[in-house]
């Protein structure tokens, strides 16, 4: 079931949140965090880093890693990657899935180094 704020299944959102929270050990979270933004049918995963110098300010830099998009009509999730021109493209090395688990596994494995570098 989806919450009133989103059109995405609560269980899937919880899995994505757990993935993000578990990606970086607690002891390193003052230097790097993995966060997510939910907008409509999409969840974007970000790598976040603190400013390199205090003069820059206190805002962390957010670099988009991957986007998961729910296609409700088909009941599947699709995975996207971002290019250097800031455009999103369908990642075609993993099939759309009714569950986020295989897509999160592909992001983690990153066989093409397109997500984590």
Tell where the protein language model's regions lie, with residue ranges.
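Negatively charged, low-complexity tracts enriched in Asp/Glu with abundant Ser/Thr
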Residues: 1-58
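Amphipathic alpha-helical interface surfaces
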Residues: 12, 64, 99-100
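Functionally constrained cores in energy, signaling, and assembly domains
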Residues: 12, 70, 106
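Generic preference for hydrophobic/aromatic residues in regular secondary structure cores
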Residues: 36-38, 65, 88
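Short, conserved beta-strand/beta-arch hydrophobic-aromatic motifs that form part
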Residues: 46-81
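Short, compact, well-ordered microdomains
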Residues: 74-117
């Amino acid at each position: 079931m989806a919450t009133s704020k989103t059109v995405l299944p609560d269980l899937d959102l919880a899995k994505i949140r757990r993935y993000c929270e578990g990606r970086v050990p607690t002891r390193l979270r003052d230097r790097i965090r993995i966060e997510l933004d939910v907008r409509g049918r999409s969840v974007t995963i970000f790598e976040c880093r603190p400013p390199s110098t205090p003069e820059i300010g206190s805002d962390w830099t957010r670099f988009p890693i991957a986007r998961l998009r729910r296609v409700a009509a088909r009941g599947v999730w699709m995975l996207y990657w971002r290019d250097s021109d800031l455009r999103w493209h369908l990642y075609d090395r993993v099939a759309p899935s009714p569950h986020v688990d295989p897509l999160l596994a592909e992001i983690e494995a990153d066989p093409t180094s397109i997500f984590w570098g």
